[in-house]
Structure formats: structure tokens, C-alpha cells
Design a protein with these regions (language model features):
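Aromatic-lined substrate-binding rim segments of carbohydrate-active enzymes
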Residues: 243-304, 319, 342-361, 398-401
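C-terminal beta-strand-rich structural cap/linker in extracellular carbohydrate-active enzymes
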Residues: 562-582
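Aromatic/acidic polysaccharide-binding cleft in carbohydrate-active enzymes
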Residues: 432-483
Length: 582
């Protein structure tokens, strides 16, 4: 048992096995870092079994969120037989850099448009010590510092530089930790900032603004997306019909504007071009799957594109340049539930994709025990996703609020300065849980929105999801549920894209009820709320401004009446409430 400080840790060791788990192939031995009993989590290596020579077991990037007592243990998984020997077992902490810098704004690929705020903002963190941090905007070509400011060292701070007087061009945001006599003790890798005229956005298929709202073809949008699977064709009608009548024509019954088809990552370019034509004609944009464009991935050798023979960078650059010219491309799906060790690889890929297709976004998704590694991915992705799948038991026994919790994990990782698009459960993960009910799917959707998600993608319209339902009536029924929910969200898109507002000044639930406030140009206020608990809760909201009435958007009836500048509501377990206030 060890006392650990917050940070990222690696547990590793060597194991030799003899006849381990011969009677139960699911058992074995492993190494773990365990937070129990004070915490409710543990992270373990892969399971070793059978007869093997000395083999390294390792799991890296384990986030320890708070100081406390933790256990490193080695031993059985399940009930294995046989013998195992361990040696050189260790737990190591990732070293913290003396200076940490995260570019908060401009938040889309360092593009500083001249019709938007000209204040460059960065989050600075210093590991220890005293001194100052010097922040500068340096001309990239000449190396001349055009603007500089020094800030006193603090554990964390937000530093700002006014770039309003700078001419258009390419600059480097440079952060230096200064010691005695202003000697440079440490320098963080530079961030590129490019000052551009507003009209430059006309060339961008996709970009997001300072409030993390995605713009597609020049129009702001709340992302409503699907994962799907299919074969490829050079016929739009084939894509429209689908293999069994469930193609893009059926998808278009819902207000879907984003699609990931993860079977088409190495499809012929002519077929992808036709697919993009079909999607764009139906108001959908596409994220091309490139999460295996790394030589270390077994699928890489199956890529038929000639550019693949030139290496990863050439492949990514060619695919991005080729597809990026199509208005139907929104970007690239670059990572799916990968460990933090993959960050350098994905970051290199990000640079190649962004250079060849500047008007695109990269999207990566965390989950499957790696969701707490989200902070490690903040610079490697344009848009972060997480995929909480809470429905594993019969209805009423699941912690749906996991969706909101994971959304906050993503928001905290990017310091609310990048979009977070959540992936929601639209499939049966277990036989006991089955398919999400319509009420559960609606609650999960709004929980993510209330916590700040700027997009939702549902997994999956394709295999393991809707496409695997054998009963035609059930398939129609489950699809109709998602169509209704996405239409409800789409109807409120102007509200969801409005700036957040302090509709409530005080609440009585002690944080058990989470809220999101919005104000629209017509003066209406909107309050979206959900109960995080599995038990009912009564909450009183003190309004920030007087009101005369409320309207429940779900029931179409008057909501709780304002009394004394406040409204009171009863929320059932995990219930969502959507109110318009005037």
C-alpha cells in the first residue's frame, strides 16, 4: 500500500507462467493499481495465462485524481490453476514538466480571425518554485517578439495577450519560465497562432468558434450523428437504399448531420466520393475513419492506397488532401478508446491531417476504462468524445448520470475550450440491460447536453446496433424512438447554440440537480435540468431575474409557477426537465 499524489502512473512487471488457467481459459494472472476501498476503481494489465517465458505486463497513464492510499497488487484473475512467477514489479509516476501550457483561445487550430476576439488566452501551470512566466507572440519567420508579458508564478493561471494591433501572419505563442535575473529555466513547445481575415473561413468546410459551436458550410450546428457500417459502391442509389433498405434514405428521417462509417476507412476513393455526394445532398457531413493509419496497426498493411507505401505521414496527407476538397467532409475519426501511450502517434497524425485539410476537425473517443486519461489527449484532438454505456441492468437499476459525469470529464480535460461530442448507447450492451428505452435514451441525451456537450453521436445504426435487430417491427420501433428524440433536440437547436446564461442564481439540491441556462434574443429564458440520483429530489431554483410563467417543453403544459422569484419542482430518478421561462 502506497500514498500517492495526483498524477499519471505506470504499473509494470515481468511474469513467467506455467500451465496457468488450463481449466478455465478466462482466468489468469495480472498486475493492478487499486484505489479500493476509499475509491471505486482499479486499473489492471492484460491477463497472462498458459505457459510463457518472461513477459512484460504494463499499463501506463493511470490517472490518480487525488492524494490517498492505493494498492499495487499482483495475483489471480478469476480462479486460475498453475504457477506464475513475478519480478521487477514497479509503479512509476509520470514526470510533470516544470511549465505546462494549454492554448485556450484561439481554440480552432490556432486560427485568430480578425472579426473575433483578439485576446490570446493560455492556461499556465508551474510544477513548483517561484519566479515568473513570460508569454510572448513571436513572428514565425523573423523570430522577433512582437508582444510580451510576464506573470508571477502560480500553480495555475490564465494568461492573456492582446493581439489586436498585430498584422495578419503566422506567430508563435512562446512561454518561458524565468528564474533569478530573468534567466530562462524552462520553455514549453511553441503553439502556432495564425492571424487571418474573417473571409478565410469561407474556405473551411468545418470549424468551431470560441463557444465550441461547430460551423458546417458557414452555418452553426448542433451535432447529431450516427455511427454506422456498410459496404461501398459508386452508385448513390445503393447508399440510399442500403443493403436491406436501411441506407441513408432512412437515416435522413432523423435530423442527422454527422456520420461515421467505420467500415470505409480504406474504401476506394471513387466510392468515397460518391458516398460524400450522397451524404452532402441529404445535409449530412462525414468523418472518415483513419484510426488505423499507423504502421503499428495490423490493418495498415491492408490499405491499398499507393500513398500508404510512402509511410504514415504521406498517407494521412494524401487522404486529407483528397477528401478535404469535398464539401461533405467534416473531418476524420482518429482514435477509438486508445491508451495514453498513443498520444504522440495520434498527434503526429493530427498535424498531417490539419496541414492538408485545414477546414476539417479530428475526433477521438475515450472509454472502456481509459476515460480518466482524457487530459492527456487535449492537444492531440480537435474534438473530444467519450462513450459512457451505463445500461447493463434492467430498466431502473442503471446509473444514467454516468453520462453527465463523463461529459464533465471531457469538459474539464479541455478546460471547456474545445468541443465535446458524446457517444451515447444505442445498442444492447448486455442481455440483462437490453436496448435503452426511449426514456433512457432521452435522459442520456439531455444529460450530456446539460453538461455542455456540443454534439451527440449514437452508437450504432449499423452492426451490433440497429442493423442487428432481427425482428422488423422492433427495428422500426427502436428507430422511431431515436427519430423522435433527435427531432426534439433539433427543434431546440437555436436555443442550444445560444450563449450559456445564468438563469438561476441559487438552488437547493446541493448539486444533486444539474442545470444549464440559456437566453434567446426574444427574451425567453430556458432552464434544462436533470436529477443525478436514483431517488426523487425536490429542488427550488431562485431565478436570476423575475418571471411570470414557465412552460414545460416536454409535456406542452404550464410548468411550476414562479413564486417569490423562485420555482420548485419534483424530479424523479434521473428525470430531465426542460422549461421555458418568461
Amino acid at each position: 500500500t502506497l500514498t500517492l499524489e495526483p498524477g499519471l502512473y505506470t504499473v509494470e512487471g515481468w511474469v513467467r507462467t506455467q500451465d496457468v488457467a488450463t481449466t478455465d481459459s478466462r482466468s489468469g494472472v495480472r498486475l493492478c493499481l487499486d484505489a479500493r476501498p476509499s475509491g471505486d476503481w482499479w486499473r489492471c494489465t492484460e491477463v497472462a495465462r498458459g505457459t510463457t517465458d518472461w513477459t512484460r505486463l504494463r499499463v501506463a497513464g493511470i490517472p490518480v485524481p487525488e492524494r490517498g492510499r492505493y494498492k499495487v497488487w499482483l495475483g489471480a484473475y478469476g480462479a486460475p490453476d498453475g504457477t506464475a512467477w513475478f519480478e521487477r514489479v514497479s509503479l512509476t509516476a509520470a514526470g510533470k514538466p516544470p511549465l505546462d501550457v494549454y492554448l485556450l483561445y484561439p481554440n480552432f487550430r490556432g486560427m485568430l480571425f480578425d472579426d473575433r476576439s483578439q485576446t490570446v488566452r493560455a492556461a499556465l501551470g508551474v510544477a513548483a518554485g517561484t519566479g515568473r512566466v513570460k508569454l510572448s507572440l513571436v513572428e514565425e519567420t523573423s523570430g522577433q517578439a512582437r508582444i510580451s508579458r510576464a506573470f508571477e508564478v502560480a500553480p495555475s493561471l490564465t494568461a492573456e495577450l492582446d493581439a489586436g494591433a498585430l498584422p495578419p501572419g503566422r506567430y508563435l505563442l512562446r512561454a518561458e519560465l524565468l528564474g533569478p535575473g530573468d534567466a530562462v529555466r524552462a520553455r514549453y513547445p511553441d503553439h502556432r497562432v495564425v492571424k487571418l481575415p474573417a473571409r478565410a473561413r469561407e474556405r473551411l468546410n468545418a470549424w468551431y468558434d470560441e463557444r465550441n459551436v461547430l460551423h458546417l458550410g458557414g452555418r452553426p450546428a448542433f451535432v447529431l450523428g450516427l455511427y454506422t457500417t456498410s459496404g461501398y459502391s459508386t452508385s448513390r442509389s445503393t447508399y440510399a437504399r442500403g443493403a436491406d433498405g436501411w441506407g441513408t434514405e432512412r437515416m435522413a428521417e432523423a435530423p442527422i448531420n454527422m456520420l461515421i462509417n467505420y467500415h470505409l476507412g480504406r474504401a476506394p476513393m471513387p466510392a468515397l466520393g460518391v458516398y460524400l455526394d450522397e451524404l452532402h445532398a441529404r445535409g449530412m457531413r462525414y468523418l472518415q475513419t483513419v484510426n488505423f493509419y499507423h504502421r503499428g496497426d495490423a490493418q495498415y498493411r491492408e490499405i491499398d492506397y499507393p500513398a500508404a507505401r510512402g509511410g504514415e505521414e504521406e498517407l494521412n496527407h494524401w487522404v486529407a488532401g483528397t477528401l478535404g476538397a469535398h464539401p461533405g467532409l467534416a473531418g476524420f475519426y482518429v482514435m477509438d478508446e486508445q491508451p495514453a501511450e498513443m498520444v504522440p502517434t495520434v498527434f503526429r497524425q493530427y498535424r498531417a491531417l490539419a496541414a492538408a485539410a485545414p477546414g476539417s476537425v479530428t475526433y477521438g473517443v475515450l472509454g472502456d476504462g481509459r476515460e480518466s486519461q482524457a487530459p492527456a489527449w487535449r492537444d492531440a484532438l480537435d474534438v473530444m468524445g467519450l462513450d459512457p454505456y451505463p445500461i447493463v441492468k434492467p430498466t431502473g437499476q442503471n446509473d444514467l448520470a454516468m453520462v453527465g459525469e463523463w461529459t464533465r470529464l471531457g469538459q474539464d480535460a479541455v478546460k471547456r475550450s474545445r468541443p465535446v461530442w458524446m457517444v451515447l448507447q444505442y445498442f444492447p450492451l448486455t442481455a440483462a440491460g437490453g436496448w435503452p428505452t426511449e426514456a433512457e435514451l432521452r435522459s442520456m441525451s439531455w444529460m450530456a447536453i446539460i453538461e455542455g456537450a456540443r454534439g451527440l453521436l449514437y452508437w450504432s445504426f449499423g452492426e451490433k446496433g440497429l442493423a442487428w435487430i432481427k425482428d422488423p417491427r422492433q427495428r422500426e420501433h427502436k428507430w422511431a424512438e431515436l427519430v423522435r428524440i433527435t427531432k426534439e433536440i433539433k427543434a431546440l437547436e437555436p436555443v442550444l447554440l445560444a450563449p450559456d446564461a445564468a438563469v438561476v442564481s441559487r438552488e437547493s439540491s446541493g448539486g444533486r440537480v444539474r442545470t444549464l441556462g440559456k437566453t434567446t434574443p426574444d427574451g425567453a429564458r430556458y432552464l434544462f435540468a436533470y436529477n443525478t440520483r436514483t431517488t426523487p429530489v425536490r429542488v427550488t431554483w431562485t431565478l436570476a431575474a423575475p418571471a411570470t410563467e414557465t412552460f414545460d417543453l416536454a409535456t406542452g403544459r404550464p410548468g411550476p409557477p414562479p413564486e417569490g422569484g423562485a420555482i420548485t419542482a419534483e424530479l424523479g430518478p434521473h428525470e430531465v426537465r426542460r422549461l421555458r421561462i418568461r
